[in-house]
């Protein structure tokens, strides 16, 4: 199996853990028609802190980053996620995962994502760069449209629908086939929760525990992994690893009392 397939399968677990939330909605809703949402949304400023907890402007001194990427993960102290298999198996404490996600996300996201616009016709448009850069120049930014649309469920939730053909455009055949299978998991839309600030100029787009739990029990994902299990030795090893991560994650989520992960954006 191509190594990229492993990353696609793993990304199926990780990506939605930070881009969607749970819902029993059947996909009904209105395209656009969400005045509060129909704006261009930008990232929160990134703030760096040193070991003493003081704000710093020197990345070499930074040990903590805050900004748009925000995670709440409440579970018993010492709860860990198992990663890897055999001699390579290791325990990653939930507290460490939370801090890593926030630090890495807030340190790097602003260099590849400038803004997200929710248009009145239901289109989602992002301004992005292909690769991270430390340059503050305005060059290099691109506009991505037709990759996703949204429907309003209520004032605190939207459904996001991915355009599979556009997302997989230009990929090698095996990579395209693999990612297409992964995206079938989200064919009914990705429900995204929204928590508004008092004046609606900030919005926190997040997932919760219920969705992560439902994803880990997703029958399409299970069937896909089972179908790949005996393809060849490398594939089988990868499938075993992913199943182990899924099983460990189920145990962790059973112990979790509150989980929210997402992006806080501002007008």
Residue ranges and their predicted role:
Residues 73, 145-149, 156, 211-267:
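Edge beta-strand at a domain terminus
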Residues 58, 67-92, 135-137, 171-181, ...:
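Flexible coil/linker segments and helix-coil junctions enriched in charged and small residues
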Residues 48-52, 82-215:
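Contiguous, well-ordered beta-strand patches that form the walls/edges
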Residues 2-8, 14-44, 257-267:
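Bacterial Sec-dependent N-terminal signal peptides
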Residues 9-10, 18, 124, 135, ...:
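N-terminal cationic amphipathic segment used for targeting or macromolecule association
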Residues 1, 5-9, 30-33, 211-212, ...:
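Terminal low-complexity, poorly structured segments
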Residues 32-89, 265:
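Tryptophan-anchored aromatic micro-motifs
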């Amino acid at each position: 199996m191509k190594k990229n397939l492993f990353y696609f399968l793993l990304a199926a677990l990780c990506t939605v853990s930070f881009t969607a939330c749970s819902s029993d909605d059947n996909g009904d809703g209105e395209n656009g028609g969400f005045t509060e949402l129909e704006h261009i949304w930008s990232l929160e400023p990134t703030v760096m802190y040193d070991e003493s907890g003081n704000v710093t402007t020197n990345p070499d001194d930074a040990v903590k980053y805050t900004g748009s990427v925000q995670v709440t993960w409440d579970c018993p102290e010492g709860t860990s996620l198992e990663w890897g298999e055999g001699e390579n198996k290791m325990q990653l404490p939930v507290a460490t995962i939370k801090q890593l996600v926030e630090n890495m996300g807030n340190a790097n996201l602003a260099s590849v994502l400038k803004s997200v616009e929710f248009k009145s016709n239901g289109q989602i448009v992002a301004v992005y760069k292909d690769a991270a850069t430390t340059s503050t120049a305005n060059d290099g930014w691109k506009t991505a449209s037709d990759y996703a649309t949204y429907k309003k469920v209520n004032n605190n939730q939207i459904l996001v629908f991915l355009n599979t053909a556009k997302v997989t455009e230009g990929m090698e055949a095996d990579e395209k086939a693999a990612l297409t299978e992964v995206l079938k998991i989200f064919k009914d839309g990705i429900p995204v929760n929204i928590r508004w600030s008092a004046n609606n100029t900030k919005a926190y787009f997040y997932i919760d525990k219920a969705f992560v739990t439902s994803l880990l029990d997703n029958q399409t994902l299970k069937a896909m992994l089972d179908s790949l299990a005996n393809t060849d030795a490398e594939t089988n090893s990868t499938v075993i690893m992913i199943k182990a991560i899924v099983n460990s994650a189920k145990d962790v989520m059973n112990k979790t009392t509150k989980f929210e992960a997402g992006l806080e954006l501002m007008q």
